[in-house]
Amino acid sequence: MTKYVFVTGGVVSSLGKGIAAASLAAILESRGLKVTLLKLDPYINVDPGTMSPLQHGEVFVTEDGAETDLDLGHYERFVSAKMRKSNNFTTGQIYESVISKERRGEYLGKTVQVIPHITNEIQAFVERGAKASHDGKADVAICEIGGTVGDIESLPFLEAARQMSLRLPLHSCAFVHLTLVPFISSAGELKTKPTQHSVQKLREIGIMPTVLLCRADRPIPNDERAKISLFSNVREEAVISVWDVDTIYKIPEMLQAQGMDDLICRELELNAKPADLSVWANLVYELANPKHEVTIGMVGKYVELTESYKSLIEALRHAGIHTHTRVNITYIDSEDIEKEGIDCLKDLDAILVPGGFGKRGTEGKIAAIRYARENQVPYLGICLGMQLAVIEFARHVANIVQANSTEFDADTESPVVALITEWLDREGRVEKRTNASDLGGTMRLGSQRCPVKPGTLAHRIYGAEVNERHRHRYEVNNTYVPKLEQSGLVISARTPNEMLPEMMELPDSMHPWFFGVQFHPEFTSTPRDGHPLFSAFIKAALIHQDATLKQVS
């Protein structure tokens, strides 16, 4: 039978519940337990797919094509289980399901209420999500509840968790509460009162924390931990200090050193072998002891909130681990390039243009791509970054001067990139869309396979086949591909059914390393295994750096 750990937050949001949940999962997995994770989001949106990256951060795409919270990216990077659509659900999905049942008459004329109908539906979603991994036989499902205790939006989720702990047999549920212990510089001390009030609020709901994770900018002294224990009614050994560190991959060792996994295993009556975190220790060592250093320029329009590119940033760091390289990322607003020119690109070892949507900032990205191509700087374009690389090549090499995307100009004379109107999804079903289709859930989503052209850079990186996750509406227009290929562009992979371009590159005779992919490889990178594309990109940056230094000397 699956046991459940509910992770809640207090005082303020963005304390790192997702990292805490993923770190606990990593420790339990190292003890031989089968672990899965769920994210319960209290917002009314059906999913984050239509939310602004500046509000929500990155949208993480699962293997089965769900647009989910970025915390699912943390989950996949910390444990071996693959997340699926059922590992993330929202208030919007819960209400949508309940209202649909009411319309079908499944409630037999009863008045539909938050308790029991909404809370029952939440519990059903939780139990369904727990069965999504490990063939439905997970030992532990760690459920992160978004928001903070006291938010009106979170109350049905907390009530559902309380009801589950009451309904299931004893020792089936544990509660981990993450809270803030701020340091007040004017007083020169840590303040525990916010944590006391947060736990009090949780207890009013009927939930007693098994473990308190106390976030601070420094380790919390034992006397302060004892004070928190006394006023929160949580045993002192279960008051765990979680302080700021330079990499999130230190968190599993930090929690395990304070016995958090033992506390959870004892509460849930789980018999498991001792934890082995040697993999995490090695990762931390590699991060702290690089042999090389490169600077990558990331040119985007959401750079003021780097959470918008969370998986991409982590993928570059993973590549650094596996190439013994410290990867410094310079974030460049593409609109600044439009206003101030390309001087900001001159000291970079490589340039990356990530995915994105909309016209704003695209000409700045195209200018950065042109700079990379003309100056032999390694370039990686992801999703929109590939589409813009094709547009730049079409304009300045293939002499298709008006080349553009119908996303930016619906009436363009040369739609080198255009809306996909029909394609097969990963299950082989025909999907169709038009300009009038809903934005939510109408993209090409999820993991899909395609063959790779022999003799290409793509083949050297990936081998004969690529299997990556997608999230896009627009695609390189096959009508223009012959002219682009005549000018030197190489389409190194296509979808097997629609023959849609999946990867493009320039031959060695034109550029040492210029590469674009329509999919999102960052979603499958992990710190343990890295990712071949990002490792190849960092190696190309090192080669370019070495060549540049030789020219200067």
Swiss-Prot record:
UniProt enzyme class: ligase
EC number in record: 6.3.4.2
Regulation of protein activity: Allosterically activated by GTP, when glutamine is the substrate; GTP has no effect on the reaction when ammonia is the substrate. The allosteric effector GTP functions by stabilizing the protein conformation that binds the tetrahedral intermediate(s) formed during glutamine hydrolysis. Inhibited by the product CTP, via allosteric rather than competitive inhibition.
Positions of region (Amidoligase domain): 1-270
Glutamine amidotransferase type-1 domain residues: 295-547
Gene Ontology molecular functions: ATP binding; CTP synthase activity; glutaminase activity; identical protein binding; metal ion binding
Pathway the protein acts in: Pyrimidine metabolism; CTP biosynthesis via de novo pathway; CTP from UDP: step 2/2
Active site: 383 (nucleophile), 520, 522
Miscellaneous comment as given in the Swiss-Prot or TrEMBL entry: CTPSs have evolved a hybrid strategy for distinguishing between UTP and CTP. The overlapping regions of the product feedback inhibitory and substrate sites recognize a common feature in both compounds, the triphosphate moiety. To differentiate isosteric substrate and product pyrimidine rings, an additional pocket far from the expected kinase/ligase catalytic site, specifically recognizes the cytosine and ribose portions of the product inhibitor.
Reported function: Catalyzes the ATP-dependent amination of UTP to CTP with either L-glutamine or ammonia as the source of nitrogen. Regulates intracellular CTP levels through interactions with the four ribonucleotide triphosphates.
Subunit and partners: Homotetramer.
Annotated HAMAP family: PyrG (MF_01227)
Similarity annotation: Belongs to the CTP synthase family.
Name by which UniProt lists this protein: CTP synthase
Organism, scientific name: Polynucleobacter asymbioticus (strain DSM 18221 / CIP 109841 / QLW-P1DMWA-1) (Polynucleobacter necessarius subsp. asymbioticus)
